[in-house]
Amino acid sequence: MESNDDRNLEAINASVGRLVWVRRRNGSWWPGQTLVHDQVPDNSLVGPKVGTPIKLLGRDDVSVDWYILENSKTVKAFRCGEYDTCIEKAKASSSKKRSGKCTLREDAINNALKIENEHLAKEDDNLCNLSGEEDSKRCLSGKEDEDSGSSDAEETEDDELASAPEQLQSSISSQEMNNVGASKVQSKRRRTPNDSEDDGTEGVKRMRGLEDIGKEQAGGIVEHKQDLDLICAVGLSDSVSNGNTIANGNKVCSPSSLKRNVSECSKRKNRRRQLTKVLESTAMVSVPVTCDQGVSLDCQGIYDSKVSGMESVESMKSVSVVINNNSDSTGVSCEDAYENVVGASHNNKAKDSEISSISVSAEDDSSDRLFDVPLTGEENHSEGFPAACRISSPRKALVTDLTRRCGRNSHNVFVKNEASNGSACTSPPASEPVNCILSGIEKNTSKWQLKGKRNSRQMSKKQEERRNVYGEEANNNSSTPHSTLYEVKIEVKASYTKPRVPLVSRMSELSGKAIVGHPLSVEILEEDYSNGMVMPPVVAKAKSLPKKNGKKQTTEKAKETVVACIPLKVVFSRINEVLKGSARQTQHRALPSAAKT
């Protein structure tokens, strides 16, 4: 049986922040904190003694006292349970205004509670760090075991395939593999709907702790093992039902099914990768395109255009290039001008990272131009270049900005369109003829898009009038280097206050009376001065109203602005007359009041 002193000592040692209750000489219990010998201040009145130093909280005037905790009955643990009511009262009174001697004791209790909370927070952080390190070590060890097991399984499968290629039979169909993989991918997407398909595991939208990372990694390993067990179980059931042979309990697959599985794995891997990494790994081939020499392209440099091999939902007016690998021709001839191909040139500039670029060498003398086209078609490629260049539905890829300003008023891509007439396009002498099949831009183009283009290219009548007044050209599409630009500084203030104008009193030279008012600055001009900027007459059109009693409504009313010069003497004479009239009115109003008094 443990004595009360031993229990008290254990409670003091287990106290958070080394907090204790100390009984003072007047009999009151005060919160304190045990110190280490190094923490004892040098200016303490009492020298070092045998025992443990304890400092009272909230009392700077009291020195450090030494107590023997094993035998002392004047020291108790802070959470011994006897003074919980005092702690609750101190918490409740911390938000209220207090006055008196009890405030010092309550402040000391609140100070002890702060120290306790700080130590608890530090201990929680240390526990989290330790648990996170242990989870990460476990995950790393699990990954190493899984990698070693998968490598051993691959080696055994390769040996079996090399030794007996004739006895290989497919035990797991590709459709079941697809179903299992698709169901697993859908379940993962349901768990994390914020993760995008292109980013994969890198596009996590929230911050996570070390514990969450360790749990997710361990959960991913368990799920992967469950998938492998499920696939093996399905293969065993199929082989038993179909009568396929199984050697030593291992599943045996055919070469065709293995190829399908490899291709499916590569596709899934590409889906999880970023678009930029996938485009960097895709092969590029140069396709020479010859244009007619009669068409003059008045270009001044190299223009960039973009081609994407993936479907774009946002691009409603794009063009796709489908390459058919069936012949050995190397040239494509384009002569006719095909309009409305560049439909989303400005909207697709922000997506340069998602689509691969096409380099166009546009020179005035040369007629051969090279286009770098990414190969995203079938796996089997024939020698040479693709046979047919087919421009199909405009939702597969983006071909934008091939020519920005070809000629003075042309924004078109020149393509030979003779497939509708049944004739083939011409090609260079060394290459065979190539059929260029052009399907038109979507017929169901909405009317509001066309109307928006017309409205953007036109200019309102008010803008034309204003530009004519100030001598500017009314050409909205001109972007020549001769256009002038003006820098206008605009200041926006939150609270605008008008400047205070003082009242000024002057003596009139005519009447000798005082004139009180605000000062006004007047600029004296020459006699022959005239303002050259006169606004044009504004024509106001009245709305058509129903005719009543045979009266005809006027449709136009002309209003002209007139600028006139008034002599300065006339202005001041008018001001004097107004001031005299106001003075007389004040005198008349003052007379009745004086009579009443």
Curated annotation (Swiss-Prot):
Region described as Disordered: 126-210, 449-482
InterPro entries attached to this UniProt entry: PWWP2-like, PWWP_dom
Basic and acidic residues: compositionally biased ranges: 134-143, 461-470
Compositionally skewed regions (Polar residues) per UniProt: 166-185
Biased composition (Basic residues): 450-460
Pfam annotation, one family: PWWP
Residue ranges of domain PWWP in the record: 16-78
Superkingdom, taxonomy of origin: Eukaryota
CDD domains linked: PWWP
Listed Acidic residues bias regions: 144-161
Designated name of the protein: Uncharacterized protein At1g51745
The organism of origin for this protein: Arabidopsis thaliana (Mouse-ear cress)
